[in-house]
Amino acid sequence: EQNPAPFLVILLFNDPVMTGYVFAAVLWLFDKDQHTLQAISVLPIPLHYYLFSKATILSVLSTLVALVIALAVRGTGYGWMDLLAGTFLSTFLFAGLGFAVGSKSRNFNEMLLYSIPLLILSGLPLLPMAGLGTALHFLPFPSTGGLGLLQQALGLPVALSRWGLYAHLLLFNALAWAWAFRLTQKQLL
């Protein structure tokens, strides 16, 4: 019988986490298209609160979807902390990337065009699951930490320590959000 864990990692990564990316990019494009950025620019709260609140909602929803998927596919035999934190932080990371790409894009088609290389590069850290390289080869990619936590949660071997995976994911969250803040702030000026 084949182990469903590798397929579950792919499903958990692609469905909830990538949904966070697409929704964040589309939310920003919608705000831009509906001319609500002017209203956002005069809010009494900083822009990052607005973005963090949207990303937090997307991340919570993504984590709940991942939990339902994991329970439906495999029951309760998981490393729950790694599964939930890996999904939440990965979605938060990709929401930041989504806001950045959405702010660079003039329309939905341009957003899709910018998304293709980003999504291809983000999927490359899945290659070690097919026996092509190790996670160490893919450290420069933002999705490596989150994928590693999902693999660890499902009992699959990983090349980095648990805390190394968390550190990787937090570092790339900081980088993605710094990029998102810089680009979205330009839209408000």
Task: Indicate residue ranges for each PLM-predicted region.
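Long, hydrophobic alpha-helical segments
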Residues: 7-27
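Hydrophobic/aromatic residues in alpha-helical transmembrane segments
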Residues: 20-24, 68, 96-101, 176-180
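Transmembrane helix boundary and interhelical loop/hinge segments in multi-pass membrane proteins
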Residues: 21-43
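Short amphipathic alpha-helical coupling elements at transmembrane boundaries
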Residues: 38-42, 106, 148-152
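Alpha-helical transmembrane segments and their short interhelical loops
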Residues: 47-48, 55-105, 166
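Junction motif at the cytosolic side of a transmembrane helix
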Residues: 100, 104, 168-189
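Transmembrane helix segments
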Residues: 105-144
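Short hydrophobic, aromatic-rich alpha-helical segments embedded in or entering the lipid bilayer
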Residues: 130-166
